[in-house]
UniProtKB/Swiss-Prot annotation:
Swiss-Prot/TrEMBL catalytic activity: Hydrolyzes proteins with a preference for Tyr or Phe in the P1' position. Has no action on amino-acid p-nitroanilides
Signal sequence segment: 1-30
Cystine pairings recorded for this chain: 173-186
Cofactor: record remark: Binds 1 zinc ion per subunit.
UniProt-annotated catalytic positions: 158
Protein name: Extracellular small neutral protease
Protein species of origin: Streptomyces coelicolor
Length: 215
């Protein structure tokens, strides 16, 4: 999912972030220079489903190796590295807390040997979940985008892709994955019951185990 920064696209997550986040871009912030292999764009397009799947597969492959080493674990632990997104440490921590409080079959945890990473910078495409040339999954958080929209919602939404959820553009504000559908007044950063149930269902059978089918 990509968060567009164009003023005409305020039908995006569209959440007044200035109050929630303030200025997040350090004066020395450099623009994002890496070229994603695929981007799960914010606005609906024919590329979104494939891009989201590519991102999820990258994470699943990394997690599958860990699950194979500990098949008896009651919950799958997905590890992330937030060191490349220091400006958003609070939002990432909130996203982790939200998801860990909402579901029980999968846990998000910061640590080494990460399954995916968070990054920050400037990008005209806004924020998005993607994969790099080596197939590793990452979430990119754009400075201007996270001033324009509610930063915790943006971060928690993007993290929802890690857990297997696609974008649902026509959904209401109560759906975390609804993207730009609800308009600028929506500040909800919590998954709804259907989203929680879907994540639980996916990971109850070990979403990571399904990675064997896409290797």
């Amino acid at each position: 999912m990509r968060m567009t920064r164009a003023a005409s696209a305020l039908a995006g997550l569209g959440l007044a972030v200035a109050a929630a986040l303030g200025s997040v871009a350090p004066a020395s912030a450099a623009a994002e220079t890496s070229t994603p292999r695929s981007v799960a764009a914010y606005e609906a397009s024919t590329e979104n489903a494939a891009a989201t799947r590519a991102f999820q597969e990258a994470v699943m492959k990394a997690v599958a190796e860990k699950r194979a080493a500990n098949p008896g674990a009651l919950a799958v632990t997905v590890t992330y590295d937030a060191s490349a997104a220091p400006t958003f440490r609070s939002q990432i921590a909130s996203s982790t807390s939200i998801w860990n409080g909402a579901v029980s079959n999968v846990r998000l945890q910061e640590g080494s040997n990460a399954d995916f990473t968070y990054r920050e910078g400037n990008d005209p495409r806004g924020s998005y979940a993607s994969t790099e040339a080596h197939g590793r999954g990452y979430i990119f958080l754009d400075y201007a985008q996270n001033q324009q929209y509610n930063s915790t919602r943006v971060t928690t939404h993007e993290t929802g892709h890690v857990l297997g959820l696609p974008d649902t553009y026509s959904g209401p504000c109560s759906q975390l994955m609804s993207g730009g559908g609800p308009g600028p007044s929506c500040t909800n950063a919590q998954p709804d019951s259907a989203e929680r149930s879907r994540v639980e269902q996916l990971w109850a059978n070990g979403l990571a185990e399904a990675a064997a089918e896409v290797r």
